[in-house]
Amino acid sequence: MSKTLLSRIKPLSNPHASNSFRSHLPITPRIKKLVSDTVSILKTQQNWSQILDDCFADEEVRFVDISPFVFDRIQDVEIGVKLFDWLSSEKKDEFFSNGFACSSFLKLLARYRIFNEIEDVLGNLRNENVKLTHEALSHVLHAYAESGSLSKAVEIYDYVVELYDSVPDVIACNSLLSLLVKSRRLGDARKVYDEMCDRGDSVDNYSTCILVKGMCNEGKVEVGRKLIEGRWGKGCIPNIVFYNTIIGGYCKLGDIENAYLVFKELKLKGFMPTLETFGTMINGFCKEGDFVASDRLLSEVKERGLRVSVWFLNNIIDAKYRHGYKVDPAESIGWIIANDCKPDVATYNILINRLCKEGKKEVAVGFLDEASKKGLIPNNLSYAPLIQAYCKSKEYDIASKLLLQMAERGCKPDIVTYGILIHGLVVSGHMDDAVNMKVKLIDRGVSPDAAIYNMLMSGLCKTGRFLPAKLLFSEMLDRNILPDAYVYATLIDGFIRSGDFDEARKVFSLSVEKGVKVDVVHHNAMIKGFCRSGMLDEALACMNRMNEEHLVPDKFTYSTIIDGYVKQQDMATAIKIFRYMEKNKCKPNVVTYTSLINGFCCQGDFKMAEETFKEMQLRDLVPNVVTYTTLIRSLAKESSTLEKAVYYWELMMTNKCVPNEVTFNCLLQGFVKKTSGKVLAEPDGSNHGQSSLFSEFFHRMKSDGWSDHAAAYNSALVCLCVHGMVKTACMFQDKMVKKGFSPDPVSFAAILHGFCVVGNSKQWRNMDFCNLGEKGLEVAVRYSQVLEQHLPQPVICEASTILHAMVEKADTKEPVESP
């Protein structure tokens, strides 16, 4: 309803005299009987309009004159609407000249919250220039405020103030104050409160308390106290309700010291603390971890003859958990009973939640069953931690059964509970089960939200199932569930990953069209798509649009564009973007530098590649497996740079960077291709100032007649094992065996020592070297002596003991014991 509409409705001359119409119509016994008979006729007679005309034909009083009393007595709003329509059409002139009758009808509509009808009636009254009472408009304001219609409530309030130069009645104003505070519009609430104080006696204690509570909830406790002093005087707090509000405000701020001062003050002034007072203080001390103080207050509650609330005890148990105290669940239940309280659902929820966090799922289930046996009805907070715990341990069958059990026990799973299970299924890759769970959710009357759709679409996109993801997006729109920014970003990225950039562009355009706040993530996804499609000009244009929209390009933005130019072999532009990135104070990351290193390597400019590698280290950036693999792959392609490839292989071991299969194969391929001549220089200590373990082993094996490939393979394993990466060494060996490469004595020696390095020597029994024989073991011992020059004495002793025991037992079938 617009202010223009309201401005056409005129007030009665005396707004505060809400019953002034009765002055010209005394409520005589005859009037009372007419009103009662009319209400009865309206309720019981089909042809009530004709009957009323007949009844009032011979009466001195017109029906319109008693209609305000009739509307006040009617309890059925439908009858009231019919009566209003009849009066508006059949007795229009008489009816609309009586503002009291229209006002009473408006009060009836407000009482039953018939807002559409209220709007229509106010529209009609505007056209008829009808006078309305202050009381009726106060009722309308109260109805709007209690229903949460803030804009309408404020509109009515402003109209009343403008029209009557007074605020609506105190009940209506208090409802508006409550709504403003709830909506966190404290400034507007304070304005209304001040007008209530300035314009007559339209403020009561509840009005002040509403605003003070709002101030305290927002952390403005001192402002709240000044508000109290402004009304009752300095240092004066009128009653226990205000004390409780102030104490609650301090506790919420974590200012337990001031809260306790106010608590002592109220007792000194003769006020009796209530259970709420004690509960707030106990909770405050619990949050601080001061359980001595909370126990002292608990004793005071008992001394004063107040009944201890289980809420107090629950807070103490929960706080002890949060502060790291060891709490026995069974003892906690006994403690509550000893305090003449019964454990409630909240008690069990606290215990179940904590047990699940401690990994004691089965014990938690026992407490859930115990709660049910005691007649308590578990809720979503009872089941959600259990479902989450079982999902975390990948026991999805049990999690699903718990969901069914919830329904059987009369607890309807909410969107959060379903979301936990769906998230667990998605993370574990059980996408079909996750989608089916969404279907069950809908079948049980729970509507999925944007977060659940986002989870499902993200999981589908990651597993390459883009069509189902697109169908889910369409379903979302069909169900009028507005996709949020994350949903759009997930779908855009999914289509780009699948190579369907056209579809990604459509989704991006749709997000803009729907008014979604497109952020850096969305633009980065599009930039990735442009770069993958070789559309680098469009990628730059997208980054420029980000600047125009006041979005700051991040490391991903620049790194993606740099990588795009590197792949186009346009290093000049890639470096230009890199410098622009630095100029805009966006620090390059490992991905950025790795892209540049790759670009230089592709051009054969290994000098610049190595300088870039050094620069990233000087900036405290740690090269990752992709960085090292990029260098090793390129350097291993040429005989002249193969030695440097070995250097970076050993450097990544030294820096605790675990190589992957690609790194391993790239290095070996360098040796496979070099079938003649020296592939590595003799170790002379000039390799960047370090001796090369790889080179030492490689040349030793070559001199013993091993092939380049076998020597390189074993040398790589030796490096891994010496640096404690025996698990990776075993994985590479398994893959080589599957390719037909048989294990040899040197591999055995390397991996045996590797297990000893990590303190797991017993694992050598699982190694597949059963056919080494006596000669093979002798070879293993010989190479172990070389290997032991690079290992600490305890490792040497342990490995040597195992090897010599194996040699001694070589001619028997007696098993060798681990030392």
Swiss-Prot record:
PPR repeats lie at residues 98-132, 133-163, 169-203, 204-238, 239-273, 274-308, 309-343, 344-378, 379-413, 414-448, 449-483, 484-518, 519-553, 554-588, 589-623, 624-659, 709-743, 744-779. Keywords: Repeat. One of its GO terms (biological process) is mitochondrial RNA processing. Gene3D superfamilies: Tetratricopeptide repeat domain. SUPFAM superfamilies: HCP-like. One of its GO terms (cellular component) is mitochondrion. GO terms for molecular function: sequence-specific mRNA binding. Belongs to the PPR family. P subfamily. This is Pentatricopeptide repeat-containing protein At1g52620. The lineage of its organism: Eukaryota, Viridiplantae, Streptophyta, Embryophyta, Tracheophyta.
